[in-house]
């Protein structure tokens, strides 16, 4: 009898870790996912389409707004406004961007605008206050600056652009660890006043992926948070371009859609709700291409993985000298 109990216990001890491993890897979770095509709806708790949900953006106030310098005439509508998502402590990156791809006076015949989007961090508020007075390019809202508040940061930037700076023809949203060629951005848009891009433009690197159910992942998503087996198509939030009309329609649609933890997925949901198609462009590089001199970046519009401001500055200067930036 004792022998049978021992065998049973041994089997349990062997099977239990396997069950835990299967659960931890999300294999059981996948069995309970809902088919996206048949069941997708958002907000998750509103199947009626009553519009009673809210993004909650109206609860957040701006602490600092841009007061723009005299680098370009204030009364001239911008061809392109760059809204750069930056962490409060990344002042060196912001300074490098001001001197390189974010320089508003880069082109004599094209008006550019630059705005840095920030949350708050107690130990850096004095520095941000000085930076705002010195450069006039800070849009800071009253929320904690943290990775999973990027959706909030993006949408508060979009709210400001939609409500208070809505004369720009196009808007580039981009992270502060990117290399950008403003020249290639303008080439993509069409250099003249008549753009060859659609009136409802939402462009960047488009992904079609599924939620990660691995519980050890930073990007783990539970069924309670998102029960469907794939995401809607989305543009990676590190760098994307919106036309003025697309920005206004996206923001208007977002007002009744609760924020989601991942900003790119959230924008994909909003675009789906607003009926805005996504345009894929390979020259928005999610993974950094090997830099082998300026010619290797001749067509790059934006590239991730430039967290070192000195390196970004060097690459940008070389590409500018070769007429690629």
Swiss-Prot record:
Pfam families: Galactosyl_T. It is found in: Golgi apparatus membrane. Glycans are attached at residues 149, 166. The chain crosses the membrane at residues 8-28. The keyword Transmembrane helix applies. It is an enzyme of class 2 (transferase). Residues 1-7 are cytoplasmic. Residues 29-325 are lumenal. It is a single-pass type II membrane protein. The keyword Transmembrane applies. It catalyses: a ganglioside GM2 (d18:1(4E)) + UDP-alpha-D-galactose = a ganglioside GM1 (d18:1(4E)) + UDP + H(+). Keywords: Developmental protein, Glycoprotein, Glycosyltransferase, Golgi apparatus, Membrane, Notch signaling pathway, Signal-anchor, Transferase, Transmembrane, Transmembrane helix. GO terms for cellular component: Golgi membrane; Golgi stack. GO terms for biological process: border follicle cell migration; follicle cell of egg chamber development; follicle cell of egg chamber-cell adhesion; germarium-derived egg chamber formation; glycosphingolipid biosynthetic process; insect visual primordium formation; maintenance of polarity of follicular epithelium; morphogenesis of follicular epithelium. GO terms for molecular function: beta-1,4-mannosylglycolipid beta-1,3-N-acetylglucosaminyltransferase activity; ganglioside galactosyltransferase activity; UDP-glycosyltransferase activity. Its EC number is 2.4.1.62. Belongs to the glycosyltransferase 31 family. Neurogenic protein essential for the development and maintenance of epithelial structure. Required in the germline for establishing the follicular epithelium and for determining the dorsal-ventral polarity. Collaborates with Notch on the apical surface of follicle cells to mediate germline-follicle cell adhesion. Brn has a role in chorion formation. This is Beta-1,3-galactosyltransferase brn. It comes from Drosophila melanogaster (Fruit fly).
